[in-house]
Amino acid sequence: MQQDYLSQQRFSDLSLHPIVRDTLAKKGFDFCTPIQALSLPISLNGRDVAGQAQTGTGKTMAFLTATFHHLLTHQDPNLEYPHPRALILASTRELAVQISNDAEFLAKACGLKTALAYGGDGYDKQLQAIERGVDILIGTTGRVIDYVKQGVIGLDEIQVVVLDEADRMFDLGFIRDIRYLLRKCPTPQVRLTMLFSATLSYKVRELAFEDMNDPEYIEIEPEQKTGHRIKEELFYPSNQDKMALLLTLMEDEWPERCIVFANTKHRCEEIWGYLAADGHRVGLLTGDVAQKKRLSLLKQFTDGDLDILVATDVAARGLHISDVTHVFNYDLPDDREDYVHRIGRTGRAGESGVSISFACEEYAMNLPAIEEYIGHSIPVSQYETEALLELPKPYRLKRAVPPQGHTRHRSYHTK
């Protein structure tokens, strides 16, 4: 993490439980990020907080640190807790899994058990883990409600509630589910509630604050919505040139770790086919991909076994993937906020990144709203049609996927 990205607030100077403080120190957490520096003094004192900051600024560690501290300082050694004491709700199952992974080192050091509850698969496995005992339940609203209604878990011992990517949960229509679960917990006055998100509209704050106890609202205002370390670039390709331009730019940029976003599953499959045929180590992440496959793809991408991930917006929110060097908007998103969320995959934690967008015949109409929202025009670049790569015959999903270890090659072309 870049030093100029951090604040002057040290974790060691905060009123942290010794186990949490020492564990963070062993993991190399010395200085807080700005959102951590502002939120932790509030949450460590048991006061509710709603924090807004750009993706990749340390929101997850902000609420995990406060959660473990609160549980350690509010436990009775003479009591056994048969039900969860903390509930962390995420907008997607991938985000829930990543939060669980991030919490693992703290859970081990603190002697607290975490468990996952999300839809898609693993119902019995998740159930068995919960029945073995859980202190911190991390999941999505639907599966958690299932377990509550079945009597598998009770929420009457909850001491901490976290809503992560809160605006996304509201956008997805989870407001009734959230309220159902919060009403099953102890009242806001006797629990700690934390709400974090990259964007937080007034409407969302108003809805969420009904179930919080006089929360303090904090915001880390970026220099610009898209992050000043992200180099943005815009092309105006014809529909005929669009795919060839993508492949050509891939060869020119040669990204170490890249996400390509498109607006539909069909378009993502098409992009995957051409990139795979061109010899790239590429994975496909859409809503139709089975849960186990999705998690496997994310792990391969994170571990560096895949260089490119082609995704719909299901992957745009909450995924904590470090070292993404490039983001391609093959299609400009219909929702202007999704542009910010997409390119927020790169330029994280003080690193630099590149965002390249195509304003094609179909989606160029989305550009004015995006530029109005981000507060600046995206620099335009030109290309020469005759310099574009010739398209290979694309792979189709019904054909065997090339081995993940397939070596990428460079195609040579005249610029």
Swiss-Prot record:
It catalyses: ATP + H2O = ADP + phosphate + H(+). A motif (DEAD box) lies at residues 164-167. Its EC number is 3.6.4.13. One of its GO terms (cellular component) is cytosol. Residues 241-389 form the Helicase C-terminal domain. Residues 40-218 form the Helicase ATP-binding domain. It is found in: Cytoplasm. This is ATP-dependent RNA helicase RhlB.
